[in-house]
Amino acid sequence: MPIKSRIRTVPDYPKKGIMFRDITTLIKDPVGFRLVIDNMTQHYLSNGIDFDVIVGIEARGFIIGGALSYTLGKGFVPVRKPGKLPADVVQLEYDLEYGSDKIEMHTDSLVKGQRVLLVDDLLATGGTALAAAALVEKLGGVVASMGFIVNLPDVGGEKKIRDKGYNIFSLTEFEGD
């Protein structure tokens, strides 16, 4: 059974008109979770994308990022919501469709020039991924690639990210969302 068929669609969540792509049904299934990690691991091993550390976006990016860090033998750095990291942080505020949000990283998370694989569960508008990339770059890191389980190409995030010159990879797409 392919990855896409293991992802639950919840209509009208979190608001009317949204088709929410819920990966919890995929990752609770040990075969599904293994497919995600094995396929992403194979992609990064076989495509010559060089990176030093994996940066995962809160919260589901932690699940993918932690497992990939283990299989690829790389360290893991979290991007968190404000107030969740105990030491000195660098913060970035970014715009959402209706409002704004903030993310943070420890100031000592990266070494200047360190190459990063940025991961999250889903790519929609691209706002959070681009904010995380800007935060990585603010700390002197270089975004080597971005990886997602799900891409919603019709929402526009993929185009925004590619237009900024970033390399992206996703395991599956849901068109029309």
UniProtKB/Swiss-Prot annotation:
**A GO biological process this protein is involved in?**
AMP salvage
Keyword Iron-sulfur tagged: no
Write down the superkingdom of origin: Bacteria
The UniProt record lists the keyword Kinase: no
Q: What Gene Ontology cellular component terms go with this record?
A: cytoplasm
SUPFAM superfamilies given in the database record: PRTase-like (SSF53271)
Record key words, sorted: Cytoplasm, Glycosyltransferase, Purine salvage, Transferase
**Cell compartments where the protein resides:** Cytoplasm
Q: Which reaction does it catalyse?
A: AMP + diphosphate = 5-phospho-alpha-D-ribose 1-diphosphate + adenine
**What EC number(s) does the entry state?**
2.4.2.7
EC class, as a word, reads transferase
Gene3D superfamilies named in the record: 3.40.50.2020
The record describes the protein's role as: Catalyzes a salvage reaction resulting in the formation of AMP, that is energically less costly than de novo synthesis.
Cross-referenced HAMAP family: Aden_phosphoribosyltr (MF_00004)
Output this protein's name. Adenine phosphoribosyltransferase
Source organism (scientific name): Chlorobaculum parvum (strain DSM 263 / NCIMB 8327) (Chlorobium vibrioforme subsp. thiosulfatophilum)
The gene name reads apt
